[in-house]
UniProtKB/Swiss-Prot annotation:
GTP binds at residues 49-53, 70, 92-94, 114, 149, 154. This is GTP cyclohydrolase-2. It is an enzyme of class 3 (hydrolase). Pathway: Cofactor biosynthesis; riboflavin biosynthesis; 5-amino-6-(D-ribitylamino)uracil from GTP: step 1/4. It comes from Shewanella loihica (strain ATCC BAA-1088 / PV-4). Its EC number is 3.5.4.25. The lineage of its organism: Bacteria, Pseudomonadati, Pseudomonadota, Gammaproteobacteria, Alteromonadales. Belongs to the GTP cyclohydrolase II family. SUPFAM superfamilies: RibA-like. Keywords: GTP-binding, Hydrolase, Metal-binding, Nucleotide-binding, Riboflavin biosynthesis, Zinc.
Length: 205
């Protein structure tokens, strides 16, 4: 994989001003983004998140998943910590793309869970890859990570790439009546590390 750094700009947000670093995968044409906040100290573990694109959750406020809640909470946590990063990867629908994700949602509306829907469409439960993150982290100067995730695959992928994951920080937010079954499937079938105690319930109406 060939990751090319393109440019950096300021990104004002409700939680403060982040820096937005653009990257291009010259093999696939996909465009990825790294957000950084504060002055990153490479000698210290940096709070961060690896976030896969979710148009429906991140931009359209969908309650079918917890993605948008996780992204906003991660940005808020980073701002409160004074430094941190988010890698925003263009891997919509756990890697199957937006239109296939809508097809999967259609199957879920008919009773399939998130894993069954992917498999009925001929995909694995999770098609994402993470090899692009190492050159992105190298560019922004991150060597050690306190990773905000519930997904053990992300921790494993980072360690296999030689990135030191010093701590896993649970990020369990956004549970509501529309995504309860989805979150249960992520826990029981995809191995996401979740506990009922940590859930923050929102938008119950």
């Amino acid at each position: 994989m060939s990751i090319k750094y393109v440019a950096t700009s300021k990104l004002p947000t409700p939680w403060g001003v982040f820096a937005m670093h653009g990257f291009e995968d010259t093999e696939t044409g996909k465009e990825h983004v790294a957000l950084t906040f504060g002055e990153l100290d490479a000698s210290q573990p940096i709070l961060g998140r690896i976030h896969s694109e979710c148009l429906t959750g991140d931009a359209l406020f969908s309650l079918r998943c917890d993605c948008g809640f996780q992204l906003q909470t991660a940005m808020q946590n980073i701002a409160e910590a004074g430094q941190g990063f988010i890698l925003y990867l263009r891997q919509e629908g756990r890697g199957i793309g937006l239109l296939n994700k809508i097809r999967a949602y259609e199957l879920q509306d008919q009773g399939a869970n998130t894993v069954e829907a992917n498999e009925r469409l001929g995909f694995a439960a999770d098609m994402r890859k993470y090899d692009m993150i190492k050159p992105m982290l190298e560019k922004i100067g991150v060597q050690q990570v306190k990773l905000m995730t519930n997904n053990p695959r992300k921790v494993k992928a980072m360690k296999e790439l030689g990135i030191a994951v010093i701590e896993r920080v649970p990020l369990q937010v956004g549970k509501n009546r529309y995504n309860e079954a989805y979150l249960k499937t992520k826990s029981t079938e995809l191995g996401h590390m979740m506990s009922e105690y940590h859930f923050t319930e929102e938008h119950q109406d």
